[in-house]
Amino acid sequence: IAGLNGVENMRSLSRNGFSQVTVIFKESSNLYFMRQQVTERLAQARPNLPAGVEPQMGPVSTGLGEVFHYSVEYEFPDGKGAKVKDGEPGWQSDGSFLTERGERLTDRVSKLAYLRTVQDWIIRPQLRTTAGVADVDSLGGYVKQFVVEPDAAKMAAYGISFEELAQALEDANLSVGANFIRRSGESYLVRADARIKSADEIARAVIAQRQGVPITVGQVANINVGGELRSGAASRNGYETVVGSALMLVGANSRTVAQAVGDKLEEIKKTLPPGVVIVPTLNRSQLVMATIKTVAKNLVEGAALVVVILFALLGNWRAAVIA
């Protein structure tokens, strides 16, 4: 990247598990052409990076691009004030939360992971289609993970190695095409979607066979819902939540973009699962409108003050207004 034409300055910030490189180009440089050049250089550097490291570029936005913040939270935090109907989606009498897919969330991590899943897979994709929005950031909660805890004694008893277990988990989470089948002059596409959606599906994944009997993951390991290690959190009114931030495209109008985001969120609310709500916390358009009203008020007051001063000096209202 240092050899790119037009680079004026570079700086980096490195922390545990995170590294950020900022490249500053000349003011006259074309933004999109420079991004293309950086993308090509990142592709060249990718083979030299450690396994599992995937470099990404930031959105086409600036440090002042955050025009709308919102909170994704439970309608009744910790179930306080909620109408409990056991067996139906929502809070249960035992303090757990039942999702519309029938998944029971019993601990803090799984409940926050559910909010993050709603933000990343339901709200964010829809909000990114709004005109003028460069990207949508997520903060707080936990990125959902399925935690597999092998039992060494059971694995030894079945003669299962850790490599076999890892390979079985990888094979059980694939989505592949199987070409097509022709029948009566028609073609039918065949696709095998084996991507994991629940802990039960992981437990049923077959590792190997012993004397013709399949050995599943659930027989040699415990599977739980967990969260990816995080370096930050978000809260509102004393309860942990997930915060979303809409980033404005460079050169866009902050007032119109913020209004469009607010309107889009009203549409998205209809697609949320039961018990989850969106609460706007920052709307840049409100700040802009308040500023415009303040400027207009100051102009009117200033004009009136000038007229009064001119009248005091000239002693004639008509002359003061004309002047």
Ranges and model annotations:
Residues 1-307, 312-313:
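Membrane-proximal extracytoplasmic
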Residues 281, 316-323:
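Membrane-water interface of transmembrane alpha-helices in multipass transporters/channels
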